[in-house]
Swiss-Prot record:
<feature type="region of interest" description="Important for the catalytic mechanism of dephosphorylation">
    <location>
        <begin position="264"/>
        <end position="269"/>
    </location>
</feature>
<dbReference type="Pfam" id="PF07475">
    <property type="entry name" value="Hpr_kinase_C"/>
</dbReference>
<dbReference type="InterPro" id="IPR003755">
    <property type="entry name" value="HPr(Ser)_kin/Pase"/>
</dbReference>
<dbReference type="GO" id="GO:0004712">
    <property type="term" value="F:protein serine/threonine/tyrosine kinase activity"/>
</dbReference>
<feature type="active site">
    <location>
        <position position="138"/>
    </location>
</feature>
<comment type="subunit">
    <text>Homohexamer.</text>
</comment>
<dbReference type="InterPro" id="IPR011104">
    <property type="entry name" value="Hpr_kin/Pase_C"/>
</dbReference>
<feature type="active site">
    <location>
        <position position="243"/>
    </location>
</feature>
<dbReference type="InterPro" id="IPR027417">
    <property type="entry name" value="P-loop_NTPase"/>
</dbReference>
<keyword id="KW-0479">Metal-binding</keyword>
<dbReference type="InterPro" id="IPR011126">
    <property type="entry name" value="Hpr_kin/Pase_Hpr_N"/>
</dbReference>
<feature type="binding site">
    <location>
        <position position="160"/>
    </location>
    <ligand>
        <name>Mg(2+)</name>
    </ligand>
</feature>
<dbReference type="Pfam" id="PF02603">
    <property type="entry name" value="Hpr_kinase_N"/>
</dbReference>
<keyword id="KW-0511">Multifunctional enzyme</keyword>
<comment type="function">
    <text>Catalyzes the ATP- as well as the pyrophosphate-dependent phosphorylation of a specific serine residue in HPr, a phosphocarrier protein of the phosphoenolpyruvate-dependent sugar phosphotransferase system (PTS). HprK/P also catalyzes the pyrophosphate-producing, inorganic phosphate-dependent dephosphorylation (phosphorolysis) of seryl-phosphorylated HPr (P-Ser-HPr).</text>
</comment>
<dbReference type="GO" id="GO:0004674">
    <property type="term" value="F:protein serine/threonine kinase activity"/>
</dbReference>
<dbReference type="GO" id="GO:0000155">
    <property type="term" value="F:phosphorelay sensor kinase activity"/>
</dbReference>
């Protein structure tokens, strides 16, 4: 099922439907837009028919210089079965030839009061957000000191309980159990909660609680950029866990790699505090302060000094 249809643009941007009502359910599959200036001159060899077409003052001013026959020919070529819609900006008068071509082909013809540049920018941002690659991950997403931390792990390991403790300590819950993730850019992942379980937290033995009702609006967020993954796993005595922090694990979600930290879970460990510190330490690393690297350098200096003596 298409993520975006022409009718969504009409509703989102309050566009006037001039003609082509039967085509408002046409799918929009790309965030790229087209301003068919060269097409107005008759060059349709590389015409991107599957894009939203914007006709601004420049295009329509040139269009007025054409003969009646050329006008009819260009507008018929502009309206194809693939074209999701044509938008005339600045509330300009719609040419009769375009109106006729729209009625014959069923291509929705829309009009906006906004300038072409402004509308183009808003449309691109909207479509990129809606058409971005998406996935869902089992885990909890919490905003800790401005760092979007995705907490993962097997069911029953204590993710939700840890998130509850973090919320009590002043941090903000984004999603529990299922985190919907969309890739808005090459290195930007944004997580949010499904509408059905938004602001809800499931605690075994207690049931489902509404975090916003219990702790207030300041305890929740609707979405957050994910920059750190913390994986909780039951402590394995046979496994060697990182004790210095020099080696950095990575986890790939869609096409983006994120820093991953594995935390072993066993009685007596305060996971909420450890995750808080992990988030703060991650921020420090991004600011150029790496405690593990500093310790390693001190150790090497001490060894070299000892060898000289």
């Amino acid at each position: 099922m298409p993520k975006v249809r022409t009718k969504d643009l009409i509703e989102q941007f309050q566009l006037e439907l001039v003609s082509g009502e039967e085509g408002i359910h046409r799918p929009i599959d790309t965030s790229d837009l087209s301003r068919p200036g060269i097409e107005m001159a008759g060059f349709f060899t590389y015409y991107p028919a599957d894009r939203v077409q914007l006709l601004g003052k420049t295009e329509l001013t040139f269009f007025d210089t054409l003969t009646t026959e050329q006008k009819q020919e260009r507008m018929k070529a502009l309206c194809t079965e693939e074209t999701p819609c044509i938008i005339v900006t600045r509330n300009q008068d719609v040419p009769d030839e375009l109106l006729q071509a729209s009625r014959e082909s069923g291509v929705p013809l829309l009009r906006s009061a906004q300038t072409t540049t402004r509308l183009s920018s808003r449309l691109t941002n909207y479509l990129e957000g809606k058409l971005a690659p998406t996935t869902a991950v089992h885990g909890v997403l919490v905003d800790i000191y401005g760092v979007g931390v995705l907490i993962t792990g097997q069911s029953g390991v204590g993710k939700s309980e840890t998130a509850l403790e973090l919320v009590k300590r002043g941090h903000r819950l984004v999603a529990d159990d299922s985190v919907e993730i969309r890739q808005e850019d090459e290195d930007t992942l944004v997580g949010s909660s499904p509408d059905l379980i938004e602001h809800l937290l499931e605690i075994r033995g207690l049931g489902i609680i509404n975090v916003m009702t219990l702790f207030g609006a300041g305890a929740v967020r609707n979405y957050k950029r994910i920059t750190l993954v913390i994986n909780l796993e039951i402590w394995d005595q046979k496994k060697n866990y990182d004790r210095l922090g020099l080696d950095e694990e990575k986890m790939k979600i869609i096409d983006t790699e994120l820093t991953k930290i594995t935390l072993p879970v066993r009685p007596g460990r305060n996971l909420a505090v450890i995750i808080e510190v992990a988030a703060m330490n991650f921020r420090l690393k991004r600011m150029g302060v790496n405690a593990a690297q500093q310790f390693s350098e001190r150790l090497m200096s001490a060894i070299e000094l000892g060898n000289q003596e």
